[in-house]
């Protein structure tokens, strides 16, 4: 007999929801929705999970995100790319806790004509990169080619053991390569 508790149902739905961008990415398939239907039948409280994921913030998180969007967000003038470098000092200044940057990389995709967003975060041990895109733009290929990363078509990550400024420079230098690859592949 299967044992399914509310905690298990909630954890499964949370993973599905966050991995699919709230079911907005093309990685959401019919089977995903069938699984969610099963979770609903097992007692999933979808509204409770959504509130916990998307509508609960602490003040320091909001200030960190506000600082990044106001002072760090750069939109490339030649290519539809937004870049957000975030220093370790900024994380410390705003009392960063795991999860405080969750979803931030997606926000620049709402800017008109931006189809790729790259968040570059300086951690104590290395620099972490998060890539997001709209449509058929394979950011996983860019992450794999230059940033020791990978992922999916519209969501990828990478990491580098270099100073933040060097990683930002490398991202900017490889933007033309990435868009040339897109052009050559017919996307």
Residue ranges and their predicted role:
Residues 1-15:
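A short, charged helix-loop
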Residues 13, 18-187:
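Hydrophobic helix-and-loop "lid/oligomerization" segment in the mid-to-C-terminal part
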């Amino acid at each position: 007999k299967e044992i399914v508790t509310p905690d298990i149902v909630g954890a499964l739905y949370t993973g599905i929801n966050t991995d699919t961008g709230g079911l907005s990415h093309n990685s959401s398939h019919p089977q995903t929705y069938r699984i969610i239907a099963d979770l609903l039948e097992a007692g999933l409280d979808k509204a409770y999970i959504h509130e916990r994921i998307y509508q609960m913030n602490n003040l320091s998180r909001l200030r960190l995100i506000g600082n990044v969007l106001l002072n760090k967000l750069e939109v490339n003038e030649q290519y539809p790319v937004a870049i957000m470098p975030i220093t370790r000092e900024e994380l410390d200044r705003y009392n960063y806790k795991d999860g405080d940057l969750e979803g931030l990389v997606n926000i620049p995709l709402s800017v008109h004509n931006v189809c790729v967003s790259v968040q570059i975060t300086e951690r104590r041990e290395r620099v972490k990169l998060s890539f997001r895109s709209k449509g058929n733009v394979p950011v996983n290929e860019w992450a794999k080619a230059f940033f020791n990363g990978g992922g999916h078509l519209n969501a990828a990550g990478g990491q580098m053991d270099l100073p933040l400024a060097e990683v930002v420079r490398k991202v900017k230098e490889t933007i033309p390569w990435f868009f040339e690859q897109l052009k050559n592949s017919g996307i």
